[in-house]
């Protein structure tokens, strides 16, 4: 559900535009920002060439009000949505920034690429695109003609499956980009620790449920395969009637992680423990919904991480994109009310 974008620097080129045309382009840039901040990332070259070119176009905007508002859009995207990747400048007869732009298109087949404005006349993006034999599935759009496409993408904010949903499609369409373009991933599933009376009373030993062991093994391996540098935080949600066995719960997950690390030596997994509490009038209640929260977007998932059955067949599920403001609120609540587990 996370969409990778490539932005040609000349979408920020206001040269020669009348006031009404400037306002129209600014509106399109705002709509684009809304889409990216809701469910996307902007891929840029690690050398910073594209970013510098955008800076140059914005610096040349003659209208100070338009310039300020455009810079606000760019600054917001740079702060929250930029992801650097290594690119190789193409040796083609086109503008230098176009060579970096199309390099991104070649490297990332499912990228959503936005080009030009009416002043992009020296080189026609459509012609360049067709001459480069880039895969047809690449999305290439003119900045002034993306209203309809933006709305289509924004409308599709959830996926519900009650039938057989191919596992590979699920990974590619929903999880892959979330994992690939994020630095951190927080997984909150308050059903992962079962509320079993005999365990809570220490009459029987606590253990991780078998379905969660299956899913943790599978998804940690998949995450490591896609992005071995991704730092994963798994929340351990301890209810009021489980406080007595908190250490037992913590130790069981630490032991489980050690077993996982034998299969996945480079596993980047840490635990954060969150306890329900009503002490001194401070009521901490763990959220009912389950989440995958990255530094880019957040997904609400009714299954949590318990997505597969014992045969690795995908269960029915309902996954929704979380509003960016709600994402910040949820992430802050979980962080404030949890502590990092000391595994020593």
Q: Where do the language-model regions lie?
A:
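Secondary-structure "cap/kink" motif recognition
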Residues: 178-184
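PLD/PLD-like phosphodiesterase catalytic module centered on the HKD motif
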Residues: 1-167, 172-175, 197-344
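N-terminal, charged amphipathic alpha-helical interaction modules
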Residues: 191-192, 196-197
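Metal-dependent nucleic-acid phosphoesterase active-site entry motif
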Residues: 10, 190-191
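Structural motif
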Residues: 184-186, 297
């Amino acid at each position: 559900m996370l969409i990778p974008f490539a932005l040609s620097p000349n979408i920020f080129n206001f040269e020669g535009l009348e006031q009404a045309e400037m306002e129209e382009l600014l509106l399109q840039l705002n709509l684009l920002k809304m889409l990216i901040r809701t469910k996307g990332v902007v891929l840029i070259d690690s050398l910073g060439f594209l970013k510098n070119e955008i800076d140059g176009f914005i610096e040349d905007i003659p209208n100070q009000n338009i310039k300020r508002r455009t810079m606000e859009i760019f600054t917001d995207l740079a702060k929250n949505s930029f992801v650097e990747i290594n690119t190789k400048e193409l040796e083609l007869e086109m503008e230098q920034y176009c060579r970096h732009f199309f390099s991104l298109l070649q490297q990332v087949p499912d990228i959503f690429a936005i080009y030009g404005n009416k002043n992009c006349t020296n080189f026609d993006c459509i012609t360049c695109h067709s001459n480069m034999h880039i895969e047809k599935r690449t999305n290439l759009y003119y900045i002034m003609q993306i209203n309809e496409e933006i709305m289509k993408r924004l409308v599709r904010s959830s996926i519900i499956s009650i039938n057989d949903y191919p596992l590979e499609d699920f990974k590619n369409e929903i999880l892959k980009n979330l994992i690939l373009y994020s630095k951190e991933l927080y997984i909150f599933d308050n059903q992962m620790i079962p509320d079993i009376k005999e365990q809570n009373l220490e009459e029987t030993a606590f253990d991780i449920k078998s379905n969660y062991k299956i899913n943790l093994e599978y998804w940690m391996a998949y995450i490591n395969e896609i992005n071995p540098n991704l730092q994963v935080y798994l929340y351990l949600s301890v209810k009021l009637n489980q406080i007595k066995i908190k250490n037992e719960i913590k130790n069981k997950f630490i032991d489980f992680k050690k077993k996982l690390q034998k299969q996945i030596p480079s596993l980047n997994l840490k635990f954060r423990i969150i306890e329900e509490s009503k002490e001194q009038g401070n009521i901490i209640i763990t959220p009912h919904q389950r989440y995958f929260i990255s530094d880019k977007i957040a997904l609400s998932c009714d299954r949590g991480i318990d997505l597969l059955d014992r045969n690795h067949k995908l269960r029915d599920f309902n996954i929704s994109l979380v509003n960016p403001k709600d994402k910040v609120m949820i992430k802050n609540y979980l962080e404030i009310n949890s502590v990092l587990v000391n595994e020593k």
